[in-house]
Structures are given as C-alpha cells and as structure tokens.
Amino acid sequence: MGNLFVKKPKITEVDRAILSLKTQRRKLGQYQQQLEKVIEAEKQAARDLIREKRKDRALLALKKKRTQEELLKQVDQWLINVEQQLADIELTSKQKAVFESLKQGNNAIKAIQSEVNLDDVQKLMDDTAEAKAYQDELSAILGEKLSAEDEEEILAEFDNLESLLIVEDMPEVPTTELMPEEPEKMDLPDVPTKAPVASNETTSTKRKVLEEPLEA
C-alpha cells in the first residue's frame, strides 16, 4: 500500500509574498476606480470655482488633480510590473523582485488611500475655518511636490478651462429660421362696387341752376 498521508508542500515566504501581491493588485484596482471619480470631482470643482471667480481655489483644485493623475500613472506601472511577475513561471526564483514589488505595492496603497476621499473635494468649495485650514495645508504640500513646469502646465489648463466655460456660458444662437411676421390686418370699410346715387335734394338743386336765365 502506498502512503496515504501525503505531506503538504511547505509554504515559503515567496508563496506568501505572491499571495500578498495578488491581494494588493485587487485593492489597487478598486482604489484606482475611486481615485478616477475623485479626479473628475476635482475637475468639476475647478470649473465651478472659475465660474465663481475664485482663481486661487480653482488653481488649487487643478494642482491637486495633477498630483492625483501622476499617482494613477505610478499605480498603473506597478500593476503592469506585478502582472509580468505573476505570469513568470520562474517567479519563485526571483525572491528579491517579488519582495521589492510587495514593498512598492504597500507604498502605493498608502499613497492612494489618502487621495480617494470625496469629502476633501468639498473642502475646496467651502468657506469654513476647517476648510480654510485644509486649503492652506494642501497649498503648502503641493507647493513642494510640483515643479515649475507643472505650475506652467496647470496655469495653461486653467486658461483653457476658463475659455471653454466662457463659450459654454454664452447664450445659444437660435438654429431655426425666423418666419417673417404677417402684416397686421386693419378693419377698413368695403369698397363700393356701384356708382353712388345722388339724393333727390341734390338733383333738384342742379336742375334749378340749369333752368335759371343767365344775366345779360
């Protein structure tokens, strides 16, 4: 008889790391979708603030959106790397790469978790003391993160968005052809169709004049 008790393979640290990578991949995929919604909300907030003539806050919203878009690019690249590693049949021999990806994944999750709160978008719109403190803190943080090139591109985005809103807010030109107005009808008396008949008095007067003798 064969051995009925088959020894289970030992789970290695690499196996655990691979499982963690898969878990991270799933979480980051969910966070990506949430962050995309936040980015859209930031853009809408910038549009609203431009309409309200609040340039400083609109620029702050666009700056925050820029950093979030950069974070999305980093997460996308990390996910691509993980997919390549998980598809590699020799993955178990690349322990260093696995643990490095796991470390990067943890950092990515921490970074993206702090950016997926839609309530923070509303703080850009509010005028409360709490919102003002948040705006000042965010402005200081973004000032350190963004380069001069980023600042120029954000200003260009602001100008472009402002121009688009001016066009959007213009009154619409009617597309249907205007029909000419019909002239107003006036109630006039009917035109007589027969010659007028003189009265008897008028006829007698004319006859009398004709019958009177002319003076010598």
UniProtKB/Swiss-Prot annotation:
**Subcellular location(s) per record:** Endosome membrane
Where this protein primarily resides, as one coarse class?
membrane
Region annotated Disordered sits at 173-216
**What does the entry list under GO cellular component?**
cytosol; ESCRT III complex; late endosome; plasma membrane
The organism's superkingdom is given as Eukaryota
Stretches assigned to coiled coil: 16-90
Q: What Pfam families does the record point to? A: Snf7
The GO annotation for biological process reads: intralumenal vesicle formation; protein transport; vacuolar transport
| Lipid anchor positions (N-myristoyl glycine) | G2
| The protein's assembly and partners | Component of the endosomal sorting required for transport complex III (ESCRT-III), composed at least of VPS2, VPS20, VPS24 and VPS32. Interacts with SKD1.
Q: Which family does the UniProt entry place this protein in?
A: Belongs to the SNF7 family.
Name this polypeptide is given: Vacuolar protein sorting-associated protein 20 homolog 2
Source organism of the structure: Arabidopsis thaliana (Mouse-ear cress)
